[in-house]
Amino acid sequence: MNDPLDSLSNDEFEIIETFDPETEDREDQWSIQQSIRIEPISIQMPNTLQSQRAPSPVGSKAPESLKDEDPDRTPEASIVETPLLTETLKEDRTPMSTPLASLVNSSQSPEFTLQNMSIVSESECSNNSSLVNVADVESTEIALRTSLLLVSELKSQLQAAKMSESTLLKSNSNHEIEENKKLSEKMEVMKNEFELKMQESAASVEKVIQEKDSAIEQLKVQLAQSQQVAELWKQGAEKNSNAQYSDSKTTIDRLLEENSKLRNLVDEEVARRLEESERRKLAEDQLKHARGGSVFDPPASFVASQLAERTTYSLNLEHELITLRKELEETKEALKKSVEESSNKDEIVSALHELAGPTGEHPHARFERAGDQQSEAEMSSTWSAGRLLELSRQIVHFISHQ
């Protein structure tokens, strides 16, 4: 790629430098392309040279002698073309002895003087060359020397800029390499720390998982034991509930039968009392007719005592009947409650929790204790039923004697 600064153009020459970035130790390759546009009027000659020669007619109209010799001459041909300059520019681009060759190898550049910078020697100025041609060549020579001086200065500036740029790039690259090295070391340290933390967290998580697994195993064992205990308790509860239900049903049936018997006895006693009162009334009427219409008048104290005794007896009998009915209802409620408790699943679950409690009591012992309590309750209910039956019998016996 060509650097835009490597291509310089002025009004006389176009100087091109080919740059290859892959080769640092290269020789500057300069090429001069012939693009001569000389206008000597615009060239400022040095004061010393202007005082030594006459004004050059280059750029003005050609002499009349030249016009007469070539009538077909174009306006561009007003610049006098000397054979010497033309042949010099048409030579092959080989190392020259002119100041252009000194730019290629700056270490061997001689001191610039008017003698060694001139491209026209004294021998080349023959009698055939006119003064006009010599002045034209000198003006061209001055312009060329000025351009070469500018090119050499630009070349030195360009080389200095390239050297400074390469130095800056090297320093920047070294700084970036150091920063990248520090950053990589820092990243390596962070990576090691992160790996260490990950290993520690993995170890802690593994430990927690093992603890939870052991706790789950213990819970499974406890659950299996609780299921076995619950099954045993359920079997015992079913047996006890069936036995209690059968016993309670038998007791209730017996009590109902006794109650029906007592009611029949009471009805019979009431009917007998009514029949006796009817017979007494009939006997009193018969006795009254037998005495000739006289009324039998028993003593009032006797009648009052008999009425008081009969009233007390009736009240006692009624009180006993009410008491028996209440006890019978209570027995029915107790039986109903025991049946409901035996069929309630929530009580089974609560019993399971009690069995798994911190008391440490063996399940069979708890079953035996529960069975003892249930047997005591059965005995209490049986004793109450027997007491009621005994009282009923006493009442019947008392009524029959009366």
Curated annotation (Swiss-Prot):
GO terms for molecular function: protein homodimerization activity. The modification Phosphothreonine is found at T74. Residues 44-54, 372-381 have a biased composition (Polar residues). Expressed in oocytes, but not in spermatozoa. This is Allophagy receptor allo-1. Its main location: cytoplasm. It comes from the Eukaryota. Phosphorylation on Thr-74 by ikke-1 is required for allophagic function. Keywords: Autophagy, Coiled coil, Cytoplasm, Phosphoprotein. Residues 1-79, 356-381 are annotated as: Disordered. GO terms for cellular component: cytoplasm; endoplasmic reticulum; sarcomere; striated muscle dense body. Autophagy receptor, which is required for allophagy, an autophagic process in which paternal organelles, including mitochondria and membranous organelles, are degraded in early embryos. After fertilization, recruited to ubiquitin-modified paternal organelles and is required for the formation of autophagosomes around the paternal organelles. Also plays a role in the regulation of autophagy in germ cells. A motif (LIR) lies at residues 13-16. The C-terminal region is required for localization to paternal organelles. The keyword DNA damage does not apply. It comes from Caenorhabditis elegans. Residues 9-27 have a biased composition (Acidic residues).
